[in-house]
């Protein structure tokens, strides 16, 4: 059976291959100097880590003492440690309240893997003995409800739907009330995939939050944005706009196994101080992993 760390290394191979090969090329029979550090900074920026984060890491490199001739393994180990330090804010756990309904609002753009992620989470917590419900609030797209139904059936969870084209906020409100009646532990609210720059759709998300607060002002327990690692630089705009609409508590990053831009995780954590709750590194339910900054940093540089 493949270990979690091995699976993570495999999933991050596109980005780590780029970084590892880049370091090997930059430092082949060369020393750590202004020229090679500039090349390393450009390499980090190319993974969508962001110029500010890359510059900070390079500054930290400059403060360390190296021999004139430096081994690439030493560079990679140092880089992994410095990346891990940049991720200090990232490892806040996805905590749930005991003996009380937890409502998790899940949002994201079309194609980010939002519905699939909800299905995996429903299965994960169902296997832990939790009573799980899912509210289908993408009411204008029948295919979304069908996709969700397939996942929820596999997870043995309760699916709460509304009429086609019903007000998503009203479906969310009814789902919260129904979940309380049925002693549900976790209610995941699946929302319509939307572009972050479409104001009317973002307003709909804000309305859902306001409506469920009428049941309990402490809800939702979590507002989570699912982001696709392949998106790269546009991720920063997504996080900013969805955070404005829903006051995000954390992120889930999907499709890391298909991206050479996984450095974006480091940049997003630094810019928004939001934790990464889970990462997706494959299609199977077990491929949704709790984020571990140490393992991520090592895997990112190919160690």
Curated annotation (Swiss-Prot):
CDD domains: FtsY. GO terms for molecular function: ATP hydrolysis activity; GTP binding; GTPase activity; signal recognition particle binding. Its main location: membrane. GTP binds at residues 108-115, 190-194, 254-257. It is a peripheral membrane protein. It catalyses: GTP + H2O = GDP + phosphate + H(+). SMART domains: AAA, SRP54, SRP54_N. GO terms for biological process: SRP-dependent cotranslational protein targeting to membrane. Coiled coil: none annotated. It comes from the Bacteria. It holds the Pfam family SRP54_N. One of its GO terms (cellular component) is plasma membrane. InterPro entries: AAA+_ATPase, P-loop_NTPase, Signal_recog_particl_SRP54_hlx, SR_rcpt_FtsY, SRP/SRP_N, SRP54_GTPase_dom, SRP54_N_sf. Keywords: Cell inner membrane, Cell membrane, Cytoplasm, GTP-binding, Hydrolase, Membrane, Nucleotide-binding, Receptor. Gene3D superfamilies: P-loop containing nucleotide triphosphate hydrolases, Signal recognition particle SRP54, nucleotide-binding domain. It is found in: Cell inner membrane; Cytoplasm. SUPFAM superfamilies: Domain of the SRP/SRP receptor G-proteins, P-loop containing nucleoside triphosphate hydrolases. Its EC number is 3.6.5.4. It is an enzyme of class 3 (hydrolase). Part of the signal recognition particle protein translocation system, which is composed of SRP and FtsY. SRP is a ribonucleoprotein composed of Ffh and a 4.5S RNA molecule. Involved in targeting and insertion of nascent membrane proteins into the cytoplasmic membrane. Acts as a receptor for the complex formed by the signal recognition particle (SRP) and the ribosome-nascent chain (RNC). Interaction with SRP-RNC leads to the transfer of the RNC complex to the Sec translocase for insertion into the membrane, the hydrolysis of GTP by both Ffh and FtsY, and the dissociation of the SRP-FtsY complex into the individual components. Belongs to the GTP-binding SRP family. FtsY subfamily. This is Signal recognition particle receptor FtsY.
